[in-house]
């Protein structure tokens, strides 16, 4: 079991925040230079026309710092096999034999990267051509979501041997066997679309996502899933930086 003290976890969130803030302005300038801006349908509300040209693909601001920090942690885990690496990790309160990363953190990272690429494709498709202002057609976007969810659910069930669910007010978990796959798919696709539905007002999606990841981080802490705790608060830090640029009036 990993031993990740809360101060280290909060440090990760802080580092993620500053990395995203520093990376954000060059990203916005680059998107403007490449004219990757929001395209609004002419038949939409007049109030939405003010968003015309606002840089899109803002998920990159969140994804890049989280990905970089996770890779660095993975490398640090590799260093733990050496004396110097163990001394470095011990400085942050990690005991010998502990790990900074594991399957529990690689799975959500893979989901984040997968949905991030799908979102980027959706944004790029909506820039010009017959799908300008629309993006990927709903059936193609949904098919992509289902595919990512299927791969993830199969990995959770067969690679991590997850087959049971816990319900509130019930002490024992319910073993649902292979039904774990469709249940996990439903939850993943549902949560993804829930974020899409809140992505209308400046700062709304980022703030609700930050609260959700913070809550999941606390749950991970209570369950002793420290790598997942670190991942959640790393994401919270990046989301708070995203809000720095996404709050009204949004630059991204």
Walk through the language-model features, giving the residues of each.
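"…together with the soluble PPM/PP2C metallo-phosphatase catalytic core" -> "…together
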Residues: 1-252
């Amino acid at each position: 079991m990993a031993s990740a003290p809360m101060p280290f976890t909060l440090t990760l969130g802080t580092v993620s925040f500053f990395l995203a803030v520093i990376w954000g302005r060059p990203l916005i300038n680059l998107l403007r230079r490449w004219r990757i801006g929001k395209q609004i349908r002419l038949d939409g509300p007049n109030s939405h026309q003010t968003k015309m040209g606002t840089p899109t693909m803002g998920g990159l601001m969140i994804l890049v710092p989280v990905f970089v920090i996770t890779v660095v942690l993975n490398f640090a885990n590799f260093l733990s096999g050496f004396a110097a690496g163990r001394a470095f990790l011990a400085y942050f309160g990690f005991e010998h034999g502990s790990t900074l990363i594991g399957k529990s953190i690689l799975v959500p990272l893979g989901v984040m990267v997968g949905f991030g690429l799908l979102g980027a494709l959706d944004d790029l498709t909506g820039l010009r051509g017959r799908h300008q202002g629309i993006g990927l057609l709903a059936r193609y976007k949904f098919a992509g979501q289902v595919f990512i969810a299927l791969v993830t659910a199969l990995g959770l069930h067969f690679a991590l041997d997850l087959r049971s669910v816990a319900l509130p007010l019930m002490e024992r978990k319910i073993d649902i066997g292979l039904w774990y796959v469709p249940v996990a798919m439903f939850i993943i696709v549902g949560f993804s679309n829930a974020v899409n539905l809140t992505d209308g007002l400046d700062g709304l999606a980022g703030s609700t996502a930050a609260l959700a990841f913070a809550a999941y981080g606390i749950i991970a802490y209570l369950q002793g899933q420290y790598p997942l705790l670190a991942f959640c608060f790393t994401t919270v830090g990046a989301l708070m930086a995203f809000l720095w640029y996404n709050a009204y009036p949004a630059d991204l």
